[in-house]
Amino acid sequence: MSAVLSTENGLILKLYIQPKASRDQIVGLHGDELKVAITAPPVDGQANAHLVKFIAKQFRVAKSQVIIEKGELGRHKQIKVINPQQIPPEVTILLE
Protein backbone atom coordinates (compact mmCIF):
# COMPACT_ATOMS: atom_id res chain seq x y z
CA MET A 1 0.00 0.00 0.00
CA SER A 2 1.28 3.46 -0.86
CA ALA A 3 1.33 6.42 1.53
CA VAL A 4 -1.96 7.77 0.10
CA LEU A 5 -4.91 5.68 -1.01
CA SER A 6 -8.05 7.10 -2.60
CA THR A 7 -11.36 5.54 -1.52
CA GLU A 8 -14.93 6.19 -2.64
CA ASN A 9 -15.61 8.66 0.20
CA GLY A 10 -12.17 10.12 0.91
CA LEU A 11 -8.50 9.35 1.42
CA ILE A 12 -6.52 7.00 3.62
CA LEU A 13 -3.12 8.33 4.66
CA LYS A 14 -0.27 6.29 6.12
CA LEU A 15 1.68 8.74 8.25
CA TYR A 16 4.92 8.87 10.18
CA ILE A 17 4.61 11.55 12.87
CA GLN A 18 7.46 13.72 14.15
CA PRO A 19 6.26 15.37 17.39
CA LYS A 20 7.87 18.44 19.01
CA ALA A 21 8.93 19.89 15.66
CA SER A 22 9.64 23.58 15.15
CA ARG A 23 6.53 23.99 12.97
CA ASP A 24 3.59 22.04 11.58
CA GLN A 25 4.18 20.78 8.06
CA ILE A 26 3.82 17.87 5.67
CA VAL A 27 7.49 16.99 5.12
CA GLY A 28 7.27 14.40 2.34
CA LEU A 29 7.82 10.68 1.93
CA HIS A 30 9.46 8.66 4.71
CA GLY A 31 9.78 5.13 3.35
CA ASP A 32 6.26 4.11 2.34
CA GLU A 33 4.63 6.68 4.63
CA LEU A 34 4.00 10.42 4.50
CA LYS A 35 6.03 12.25 7.15
CA VAL A 36 4.18 14.95 9.09
CA ALA A 37 5.94 17.22 11.59
CA ILE A 38 3.82 18.73 14.38
CA THR A 39 4.72 21.05 17.24
CA ALA A 40 2.75 19.25 19.96
CA PRO A 41 4.52 16.86 22.37
CA PRO A 42 3.49 13.17 22.46
CA VAL A 43 1.92 13.50 25.94
CA ASP A 44 -1.67 12.75 27.01
CA GLY A 45 -2.97 12.63 23.44
CA GLN A 46 -1.86 16.19 22.67
CA ALA A 47 -0.03 15.11 19.52
CA ASN A 48 -3.05 13.18 18.22
CA ALA A 49 -5.41 16.11 18.85
CA HIS A 50 -2.98 18.51 17.21
CA LEU A 51 -2.48 16.16 14.25
CA VAL A 52 -6.24 15.86 13.66
CA LYS A 53 -6.58 19.65 13.79
CA PHE A 54 -3.64 20.15 11.38
CA ILE A 55 -4.86 17.52 8.88
CA ALA A 56 -8.42 18.93 9.02
CA LYS A 57 -7.05 22.39 8.23
CA GLN A 58 -4.88 21.11 5.35
CA PHE A 59 -7.79 19.22 3.73
CA ARG A 60 -10.44 21.84 4.67
CA VAL A 61 -12.71 19.45 6.52
CA ALA A 62 -14.21 19.35 10.01
CA LYS A 63 -12.12 17.65 12.70
CA SER A 64 -14.86 14.99 12.94
CA GLN A 65 -14.04 13.98 9.34
CA VAL A 66 -10.45 13.05 10.27
CA ILE A 67 -10.31 9.61 11.89
CA ILE A 68 -7.23 7.90 13.32
CA GLU A 69 -7.84 4.29 12.26
CA LYS A 70 -4.55 2.78 13.45
CA GLY A 71 -1.60 3.87 15.55
CA GLU A 72 -3.26 5.88 18.30
CA LEU A 73 -0.24 5.36 20.59
CA GLY A 74 2.65 5.29 18.09
CA ARG A 75 4.39 7.40 15.47
CA HIS A 76 3.10 5.24 12.61
CA LYS A 77 -0.56 6.09 11.98
CA GLN A 78 -3.27 5.39 9.45
CA ILE A 79 -5.72 8.25 9.08
CA LYS A 80 -8.91 8.52 7.07
CA VAL A 81 -10.00 11.90 5.70
CA ILE A 82 -13.67 11.87 4.68
CA ASN A 83 -14.65 13.95 1.63
CA PRO A 84 -11.65 16.33 1.53
CA GLN A 85 -12.50 19.77 0.12
CA GLN A 86 -8.87 20.47 -0.80
CA ILE A 87 -5.85 18.23 -1.25
CA PRO A 88 -2.41 19.66 -0.37
CA PRO A 89 0.18 19.57 -3.20
CA GLU A 90 2.40 17.15 -1.24
CA VAL A 91 -0.47 14.64 -1.24
CA THR A 92 -1.65 15.34 -4.81
CA ILE A 93 1.76 14.25 -6.14
CA LEU A 94 1.40 10.89 -4.39
CA LEU A 95 -2.08 10.28 -5.83
CA GLU A 96 -0.84 10.39 -9.44
Curated annotation (Swiss-Prot):
One of its GO terms (cellular component) is cytoplasm. Gene3D superfamilies: YggU-like. PANTHER family: UPF0235 PROTEIN C15ORF40 (PTHR13420:SF7). Belongs to the UPF0235 family. This is UPF0235 protein YPK_0828. It comes from Yersinia pseudotuberculosis serotype O:3 (strain YPIII). The lineage of its organism: Bacteria, Pseudomonadati, Pseudomonadota, Gammaproteobacteria, Enterobacterales.
